[in-house]
Curated annotation (Swiss-Prot):
GO terms for molecular function: 4 iron, 4 sulfur cluster binding; 5-amino-6-(D-ribitylamino)uracil--L-tyrosine 4-hydroxyphenyl transferase activity; 7,8-didemethyl-8-hydroxy-5-deazariboflavin synthase activity; iron ion binding. [4Fe-4S] cluster binds at residues 59, 63, 66. Binds 1 [4Fe-4S] cluster. The cluster is coordinated with 3 cysteines and an exchangeable S-adenosyl-L-methionine. Keywords: 4Fe-4S, Iron, Iron-sulfur, Metal-binding, S-adenosyl-L-methionine, Transferase. It comes from the Archaea. Its cofactor is [4Fe-4S] cluster. Pathway: Cofactor biosynthesis; coenzyme F0 biosynthesis. It comes from Methanococcus maripaludis (strain DSM 14266 / JCM 13030 / NBRC 101832 / S2 / LL). The gene is cofH1. Residues 45-282 form the Radical SAM core domain. This is 5-amino-6-(D-ribitylamino)uracil--L-tyrosine 4-hydroxyphenyl transferase 1. InterPro entries: Aldolase_TIM, CofH/MnqC-like_C, CofH_family, Elp3/MiaA/NifB-like_rSAM, F420, FO_synthase_su2, rSAM.
Length: 359
């Protein structure tokens, strides 16, 4: 395999599968990705001071990888009002956060107008403190809420944008293959529906991230197809701000008990996903984020030498990974994030949601 040709060449899905299957050139693949990272984004490693706000853990979804969900009436169930969400956002803003990531569940009482009320309250309460970027509602949440409100996705996104939605998390992607989705998240939106929601968001002027959850039942061909779909969307809309690989946290997830399911990804696969995504996307998607919550500090630092150039955020509150068995904490101070980056000889810089550097 002529790896150096991949530095300039646009990879096909076949090339991508071959890279995932290649065990002999593991370190050369990482080295190539790091070289591309340096060419495309330099030695700066970005981070965002942010807070996660999950406004409910009650959900009608049937995702088999989720350990966060609660049923109505469960002693640990909660549902925050728009005013309560806004107060949490204000607390985050007062402690220096420039972004809040707001997500909830799938319920009949959550429609587009409820989501818009959350946005409105957050924008109003933080205005005195310079405002805050709101990164909220997954494609699945947007679609479900639109249906509950009797709106099209396009109409719903227009309302959300008018009420202050700055960007959306590109979660609910998992693996963009309907055969895989039918096993791991049978009632979630189909691949074509996920594509429609994010593409419509981009055309409405709402940027999104994009994600891929791996290390469960997927095969290499599914990873290649997923990356190919994301690249195609980016070529058409340019609306993805970053790619975030999400390693499957298996410990508490119901999916873990299925016969075919792996016990999460190996450390080698984690690093390969970062590297191959960098080689595959090149500068179509310039920013690749590593997740210290899922990988831990040390593996995240290594991933910065395998294609990644962003270490995510301080989070302040992160419940979903913790519920699934994540053991790396739910908050990291800005100073610790900087130290993480400096320790591997790179330059830490704070950014906002749109990857603009905050001096």
């Amino acid at each position: 395999m002529d790896l150096m040709s991949f530095k300039e060449k646009e990879l096909s899905k076949k090339d991508c599968v071959e890279l995932f299957e290649d065990t002999e050139n593991f370190f050369d693949i990482l080295k190539l990705a790091d070289s591309l990272r340096k060419d495309i984004v330099g030695d700066t490693v970005t981070y965002v001071v942010n807070a996660n706000i999950n406004f409910t853990n009650v959900c009608s979804g049937t995702c088999k990888f989720c350990a966060f969900k609660a049923e109505h009436g469960d002693p640990n169930a909660f549902f925050l009002s728009p005013e309560q969400v806004a107060k949490k956002a204000l607390e985050a803003r007062k402690t220096g956060a420039t972004e809040v990531c707001i997500q909830g569940g799938l319920l009949k009482e959550i429609d587009t107008y409820f989501q818009a009320e959350i946005l409105k309250k957050v924008k109003e309460i933080t205005k005195t403190y310079g405002g805050i970027d709101v990164h909220a509602f997954s494609p699945m949440e947007v679609k479900s809420a639109a249906e509950n409100a009797g709106l099209s996705v396009k109409e719903a996104l227009k309302i959300l944008k008018e009420n202050g939605l700055n960007s959306m998390p590109g979660t609910a992607a998992e693996i963009l293959d309907d055969e895989v989705r039918s096993e791991i998240c049978p009632t979630k939106l189909k691949t074509s529906e996920w594509i429609d929601v994010v593409s419509t968001a981009h055309k409405t002027g709402i940027n999104t991230t994009c994600t891929m959850m791996y290390g469960h039942i997927e095969e290499n061909k599914h990873l290649a197809e997923h990356l190919s779909i994301l690249r195609k969307i980016q070529k058409e809309t340019g609306g993805f701000t970053e790619f975030v690989p999400l390693t499957f946290l298996h410990e508490n997830a119901p999916l873990h008990h299925m016969d075919r399911v792996k016990s999460g990804a190996s450390g080698m696969l984690d690093l390969k996903v970062y590297a191959i995504s960098r080689i595959f996307f090149k500068d179509y998607i310039k920013n690749i984020q590593t997740s210290w919550v899922k990988l831990g500090t040390k593996l995240s630092q290594i991933s910065l030498n395998c294609g990644a150039n962003d270490i995510g955020g301080t989070l302040m509150e992160e419940s979903i990974s913790k519920a699934a068995g994540g053991s790396y904490g739910t908050y990291m101070s800005e100073e610790k994030l900087k130290d993480m980056v400096l320790a591997v000889g790179r330059i830490p810089k704070q950014r906002n949601t749109c990857y603009e550097i905050i001096e």
